[in-house]
Amino acid sequence: VFSHKTGGDRDEQLEAIPVERDDRNQAIGPMQKIQARTTFTFPGRNGKYSNLTWTGQHFDTVHQNTLPPGDARIYRTKPKTFATEVHHHYGTDDFQLACAIDTDHPAVQDDLKLWGEWINDTTGVDGFCFEGAAYLRPTFLNEWLVHVRRYSRRKLFAVGDYWAEDVESLHHFISTTGGQLAMLDVPLHYNFHRASRAGGRFDLRRILFGTLMREQPTLAVTFVENHNSQPLRALESVVEPWFKPLAYAMILLRREGYPCVFYGDYYGGHYVDIGRDRQPHEIWLNSHRFLIDKFLYARKHYAHGPQYDYFEHPDCLGWTRLGTPDFPKAMAVVLSDAAGGAQWMEVGKPNTIFRDVTEHIPGLVQTNEAGWGDFRCLGGSVSVWVEV
């Protein structure tokens, strides 16, 4: 976690100014002395990994002041300023919680780069996911990635978890970091969320509008659900179970993006947590493993080559993959969020037999002499037709 530290070893007195919680650029009191747990000595490590002792000078914001007991205001420490290149939610997102790390401080930069070298040498990691990327200064993140990639002599994959429904915020972050890391396609997730709750009234022709999958496909990490959006989480935006197979077909069987499968969607899950009504709720997550395995099989063997889209109908979409010399067999995908439907689509294989690997529709489809076929799906469902 590059944005903050918590659970320090000692209190420290600092000069700081309290700021408004909902607009952190606005001071709500004078500069004053506070006491916060900003000293991190890590006594158990005994300097083995780093000689840096973290103190108040290495943080720009804190979320505690123990001089008056119970003071949980946000304080900007003297003489720090908030970064200007981060997202401007709450005036600035240069603070998430606890003790916010000042990545402009040279000692902080050196220590985080040293950690990058250590984690590379110790684990052989082949990539990084930056949780809460909205709270990180893009310029330092870019510098850190360049350093660690040069050190490792590998093109380490990197993805930022930047929870913004507005795709323009993601474009801005990508631009600021020079395209050094991919981004979670949060706008696509919200399109799935809305479509799943629209009762068949969502215009599927617009399912990719305003998404990285459509606008920057080589930097889009696509997902259906994750730990942020699942039930009872702070950013709850559930994709309803009936729609998840349609959504997974879209991220796994198209050429755009780097798809992720959520553990809870694959294995299912069960937990109890507190809802917004402050009452406990029992949650069961359905396993979609049967169909996800079918999609993964189709992705491996058939989702190759040119892609033709058939997005003319508001309730029924389709696309085809025509194959490559190494993976010559074709595939046709058709899905509907309302009544069952069909798409007349080209697969480039004349007089060829196709079967539905999802097993939703029995029987076979044969293409005509021009390589076109009538591929069907059931209502609120998806079928994946592959060359026999």
Predicted features, each with a name:
Residues R73:
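Surface-exposed loop and adjacent secondary-structure segments within mature catalytic domains
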Residues F2-K5, D11-G47, N51, G56, ...:
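Active-site-proximal helices and loops of the catalytic beta/alpha 8
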Residues T53, R76-T123, A133:
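Active-site-adjacent "subsite" loops/lids of carbohydrate-active enzymes
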Residues H58-V62, P69:
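Intrinsically disordered, low-complexity transcriptional activation domains
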